[in-house]
């Protein structure tokens, strides 16, 4: 025997063959799961391919030679333990001699590349594990698109770059960020509603560790994270799940999808087959991954209508799937918030709330109507008081102002010729902030608070220069959000969904008055300013102004009509008071003023040409460490020169 020739051939055989295959893995889990136990270290590979004649795995750990998996005795799964495999190595399954990304792959190179073994246990969550769930009555949601939120040089922003703005979000006062879909999609830019890999996090946004760092940073700053999930359709492009194990019927998608007319959606024939237990479990496992591995605090389910209906025909399978997943959440993670985009309550499938599109369309029209005569105060009264916390109320979202839907931002729709002008600012500020005083859970879309008027697009970065140009508008949002969440400790009226009394509706003058607990709201939806408008207050005596959207501190062009914050009006013995109301403005009153030592101002960006000193005021309740972090973030974000000597002075 020629030993010199035999040894190289033997080495080549072992490299191609990889580790010896067990009959099947005795370890649990689907996909690629690193293990370190009494049996050693390595990775378990398991995939569902009931109709396949052969399944193998190949990757960097085999020199890209194929190693066969063993078909398990039940369930249509194939598995193997490979001691040579490690986290961070690329791999693919080989199903009937066809290379496939892992449908359960937790990380990918990209939507057309390889899967990557990922170890969830390697991430250090630190003290963020102590984060407490946000109570429903304390939720103020900020919808964010990770790719556009902090993008520069036409590159999509990563979750790490989004995390650089958490100090801003904390100062703004929001209590939750709702991320548009984060799963892998084709290319580097997308809204995210075309997922290709349902367990992997979009690589262009930084992948799984970057998302975890974002969630960790949010939790460390008291902000919850919700995730938008898409299960009404997948893809339709870059879907390695398509005809995954070789079986399909009628040219449809095989085991993961319906294989008849029920597969058809507006986005392709890629509706998951909710009638299969394995597909329902696949979806539930994704939700479980987000909660237990990424520590997310809630979900918004996209287009629930197209889960519960197929081409307009009722689909009980979809309702069964939603009930299964939501019931699992209720029993295992009851604090995780469950929101549907639509049709949450056609029957009980376990959702707590849904997006209120009627609020959007009705309230938005108050701003966009061509004349004051078209603004209906009865509609406003209804929208402010109905529904409670089972609805998420908003005036802008990705759908309402995005390029894919050929929509525009509210300021543009108000005045397309001058979206940065007086009328656009007045009406947009008034109408956008009505969500913050309603009985529902308010949501703001990224940029609304800085009067962004460019159409939302995954190709258009949010213009952070607007936080300087429209610093007063940002401050108006912050003031109202802090009032909503009772940050000053003087009133929790806006946290009670059942205390709404719209007691004054004047359709002729376009003025509405509302009582919520100990608060009085006066809302003027007309271009007419009033100097002595009579409004009934809950009781006589002195009432303090907590908010006035017409103040020139919010915009120098505003009318400055009515009292400043802390100013007073006096209700007479009949509990009526004459109010000075600016055009398209809102005022809020209470008999309990904002404590002087608890008031806060919010400068959202360094002013142009700032001098030798800049004052940053923060909430004393946040504590000195939070204040120091805020100062540090301001200095770092704005790259102030000569800011090495920062002096902080505490008062109150």
PLM feature segments, named:
Residues 8-17:
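Bacterial N-terminal signal peptides
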Residues 47, 144, 169, 179, ...:
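Conserved, mostly hydrophobic/aromatic
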Residues 109-112, 128-136, 145-298, 303-333:
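Substrate-binding/active-site clefts of carbohydrate-active enzymes
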Residues 140-144, 177, 225-227, 299, ...:
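Hydrophobic faces of well-ordered beta-strands that scaffold small-molecule active sites
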Residues 540, 581-586:
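Tight coil/turn sites that cap or link beta-strands
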Residues 41, 45-48, 55-59, 526-542, ...:
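Surface-exposed beta-strand/loop patches in extracellular or lumenal glycoproteins
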Residues 15, 21-44, 49, 64-143, ...:
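The feature marks proteins involved in alpha-glucan
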Residues 108-119, 295, 311, 316-457, ...:
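Conserved alpha/beta catalytic core and glycan-binding cleft of carbohydrate-active enzymes
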């Amino acid at each position: 025997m020629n030993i010199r020739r035999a040894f190289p051939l033997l080495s080549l055989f072992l490299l191609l063959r990889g580790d010896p295959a067990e009959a099947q893995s005795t370890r649990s889990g689907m996909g690629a799961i690193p293990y370190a136990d009494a049996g050693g270290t390595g990775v378990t590979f398991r995939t569902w391919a009931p109709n396949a004649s052969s399944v193998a795995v190949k990757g960097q750990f085999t020199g890209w030679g194929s190693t066969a998996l063993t078909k398990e005795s039940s369930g249509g799964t194939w598995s193997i333990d490979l001691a040579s495999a490690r986290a961070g190595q690329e791999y693919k399954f080989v199903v009937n001699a066809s290379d496939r990304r892992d449908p359960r792959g937790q990380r990918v190179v990209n939507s057309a590349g390889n899967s990557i073994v990922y170890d969830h246990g390697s991430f250090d969550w630190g003290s963020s594990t102590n984060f407490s769930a946000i109570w429903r009555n304390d939720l103020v949601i900020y919808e964010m698109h990770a790719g556009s939120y902090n993008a520069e040089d036409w590159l999509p922003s990563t979750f790490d770059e989004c995390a650089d703005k958490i100090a801003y979000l904390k100062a703004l006062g929001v209590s939750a960020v709702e991320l548009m879909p984060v799963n892998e999609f084709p290319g580097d830019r997308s809204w995210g509603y075309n997922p290709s890999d349902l367990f992997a996090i979009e690589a262009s946004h930084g992948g799984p560790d970057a998302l975890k760092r974002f969630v960790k940073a949010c939790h460390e700053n008291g902000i919850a994270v919700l995730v938008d999930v898409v299960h009404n359709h997948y893809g339709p492009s870059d879907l390695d799940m398509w005809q995954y194990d070789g079986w399909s019927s009628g040219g449809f998608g095989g085991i993961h999808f319906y294989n008849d007319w029920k597969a058809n959606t507006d986005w392709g024939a890629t509706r998951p087959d909710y009638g299969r237990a394995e597909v329902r479990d696949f979806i539930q496992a994704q939700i479980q991954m987000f909660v237990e591995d990424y520590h997310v605090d809630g979900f918004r389910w996209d287009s629930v209508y197209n889960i519960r209906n197929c081409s307009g025909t009722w689909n009980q399978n979809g309702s069964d799937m939603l009930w299964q997943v939501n019931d699992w959440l209720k029993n295992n993670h009851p604090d995780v918030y469950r929101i549907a985009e639509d049709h949450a309550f056609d029957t009980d499938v376990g959702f707590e709330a849904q997006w209120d599109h009627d609020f959007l369309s009705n309230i938005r029209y108050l701003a966009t109507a061509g004349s004051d005569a078209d603004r209906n105060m009865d509609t406003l009264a209804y929208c402010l008081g109905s529904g409670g916390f089972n609805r998420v109320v908003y005036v802008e979202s990705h759908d309402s102002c995005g390029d894919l839907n050929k929509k525009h931002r509210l300021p543009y729709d108000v005045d397309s010729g001058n979206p940065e002008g007086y009328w656009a600012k007045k009406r947009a500020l008034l109408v956008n902030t009505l969500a913050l005083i309603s009985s529902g859970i308010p949501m703001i879309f990224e940029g609304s608070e800085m009067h962004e008027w460019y159409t939302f697009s995954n190709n258009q970065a949010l213009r952070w220069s607007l936080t300087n140009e429209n610093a007063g508008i940002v401050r108006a949002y912050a003031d109202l959000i802090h009032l909503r969440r009772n940050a000053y400790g003087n009133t929790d009226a806006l946290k009670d969904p059942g205390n709404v009394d719209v007691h004054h509706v004047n359709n002729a003058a376009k003025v509405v008055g509302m009582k919520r607990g100990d608060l009085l709201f006066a809302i003027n939806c007309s271009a007419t300013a009033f100097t002595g408008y009579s409004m009934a207050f809950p009781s006589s005596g002195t009432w303090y102004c907590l908010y006035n959207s017409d103040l020139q501190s919010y915009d120098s062009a505003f009318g400055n009509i009515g009292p400043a914050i802390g100013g007073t009006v006096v209700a007479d013995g009949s509990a009526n008071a004459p109010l000075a109301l600016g055009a398209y403005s809102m005022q809020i009153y209470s008999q309990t003023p904002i404590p002087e030592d608890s008031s806060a101002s919010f400068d959202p960006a360094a002013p142009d040409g700032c001098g030798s000193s800049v004052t940053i005021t923060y909430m004393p309740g946040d504590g000195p460490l939070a204040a120091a972090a805020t100062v540090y973030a301001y200095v770092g974000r704005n790259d102030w020169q000569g800011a090495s000597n920062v002096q902080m002075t505490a008062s109150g």
